[in-house]
Amino acid sequence: METTTELSHSRLLGTYSYPTSHRVIEIVSIAVFAVFYAVFGLRAVAAVGDDLDVATVGLTVLAAFLALVLADFLSGMVHALCDNLGSVDTPVVGQKFIRSFREHHTDPLDMTRGDFVRVNADNFLVCLPILIPCVLWLNVGSNPFVSTFLVVLMAFVVVTNQIHKWAHTDQVPGPVQWLQARRIVLSPDHHRVHHTPPYDSHYCITSGVTNPLLTKVGFWPVLLRFCRWAGRFLGGSPATGSSQGPGA
């Protein structure tokens, strides 16, 4: 996600507030992902259909559940690291990733004003190094468990920022409310904990399903101690309470 003050308008590229070159990369990333994901998804469906029995269905459901759990955990890891390690000046990731998370805590509602491309394109982009080899070179599409796991994992990864946006949006579509109520995707009430002092837990933003367990086992304090230690070498400073902004 990018934030600046001047808006650019284009019939082809939409409305955006950052360099046109970045906008083009974002749109191309989404388009490339859509093509390769469709191919991989069809292979996954075929793999499940070719050996459809009770065991296959059970493994498929298990794969989907594990994929959701992993996607949620990964979202929390990325979120926590970007909140607490490095700075906007960190090479490679500073401007593209860390900046978005830091600015989100200054103005949590900024992402609700962004369009689909601005909010989600980064996640489409980071999936391509996994998706493209799976389609072109790796024979994982023929395995029902592995293919289902990857299809569901990438689906949740690419929509994580959209889910996060919904958690900050007052009015969302009925189906989204249904998913939020059943904790399939992140709910506003659950996410509000992260925007409440001391701002040091509930980093997972896909469904939030892993937050209670990670909090109970004391995972976040350990990770934050690591960030403070690593920060001595990598530079930067964590987001502080005064920069966390208003609640969810």
Give the residues covered by each predicted segment:
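Cytosolic/stromal cytosol-facing helical appendages immediately following the last transmembrane segment
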Residues: M1-V24, V54-G58, D89-T90, T106-V117, ...
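Core segments of transmembrane alpha-helices
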Residues: S29-Y37, R118-L136
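Transmembrane alpha-helical segments that form the membrane-embedded catalytic/substrate-channel core
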Residues: V69-C82, V151-V172
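Interfacial segments of alpha-helical transmembrane regions
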Residues: D53-A67, G141-F156
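Short, hydrophobic transmembrane alpha-helix segments
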Residues: V39-T56
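The first (N-terminal) embedded transmembrane alpha-helix
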Residues: S21-A44
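Membrane-helix interface/capping segments
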Residues: G76-D110
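Transmembrane alpha-helices and immediately adjacent membrane-cytoplasm interface residues
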Residues: L66-L74, P133-W137
